[in-house]
Regions:
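Residue-level detector of Asp-centered blade-edge/turn motifs that repeat once per structural unit
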Residues: 9-13, 73-76, 138-140, 214-218
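Surface-exposed loop and turn segments in beta-propeller and other repeat-based domains
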Residues: 1, 47-66, 100-126, 174-202
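Beta-rich catalytic cores
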Residues: 2-5, 23, 37, 67, ...
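Beta-propeller blade signature
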Residues: 34-47, 96, 161-174
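Short, conserved, GDST-rich strand-edge loop motifs in beta-rich repeat architectures
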Residues: 18-39, 145-166
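Structural signal for beta-propeller blades
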Residues: 25-26, 41, 87-90, 152-153, ...
Length: 236
């Protein structure tokens, strides 16, 4: 068991969770998964002891090889975890039981630029898997994901081979989408001058990080776009 990708500590400080990805080797198997050993969620009791949560068999994509990417813990001790390459999400209680899991689905993107030609010309469309990277709880019932994408998968339910939806999503922990930015996140950055033209045909601005904060009584969501070298700020 190795290759930890993300660590979070419960708000009460009683335990930590680690997303152990066991990331695929892109130099073998044409970059495709499954590539065992599979990833797991490790839960470390701060007084001693560790529990491993089996995440196999959950996702539609490579169910034998879950690749957990990012974790966060809410005030109830519930962990939300992204399985990025598997395009899946799971919620686990503090006892290590899987409370819910669901596909991250895909997004119909319209008015995007998919051509590396030195100009921003948003006239294209694409159906893309979300493949979320970072995740953060907004409250005990909702969390947000930054849908970077990290996997090339041909012919999956009509989606583009490259994952990543160029935006971010707010979810209810029951799997319901509460808010979807679609292409508007990338559009706002491009119109502000943050457009990575070399990434147009791939994953665009690549939203990779997301966090929340409260300032003067207002809750905000911050979404980092790796390739655009920018951060979007939203009123939660």
């Amino acid at each position: 068991i190795g290759q930890p990708d993300s660590v979070a500590i419960s708000p009460d400080g009683s335990f930590a969770v680690i997303a152990i990805e066991n990331e695929r080797n892109e130099d073998i198997n044409d970059e495709m998964i499954p590539q065992l050993p599979e990833g797991v969620l490790a839960m470390l009791d701060m007084t001693g002891g560790v529990q491993y949560v089996d995440l196999t068999g959950l996702a539609d994509i490579a169910p034998s090889d879950p690749e957990p990417e990012f974790v966060d813990v809410n005030d109830l001790g519930e962990t939300v975890i992204t399985l990025q390459e598997n395009n899946h999400l799971a919620v686990v209680d503090k006892g290590g039981n899987i409370l819910n899991h669901f596909s991250a689905g895909w997004v119909e993107l319209n008015n995007i630029d998919t051509k590396k030609d030195g100009v921003y010309n948003p006239v294209d469309s694409r159906t893309s898997r979300r493949e979320p990277d970072a995740v953060v709880w907004i409250d005990n019932d909702h969390f947000a994901t930054a849908n970077e994408g990290d996997y090339k998968l041909k012919g999956y339910q009509g989606t583009h081979k490259r994952g990543g939806s160029r935006g971010w999503t707010i979810w209810n922990k029951d799997g319901t989408v509460v808010y979807e930015s679609g292409a508007t996140f990338e559009t706002a950055l491009a119109e502000a001058g943050f457009w990575p033209d070399k990434r147009a045909g791939k994953k665009g601005v690549e939203p990779e990080s997301v966090t929340v904060g409260t300032f003067e009584g207002t809750r905000y969501i911050f979404v980092g776009a790796e390739r655009a070298d920018a951060v979007g700020v939203y009123d939660a």
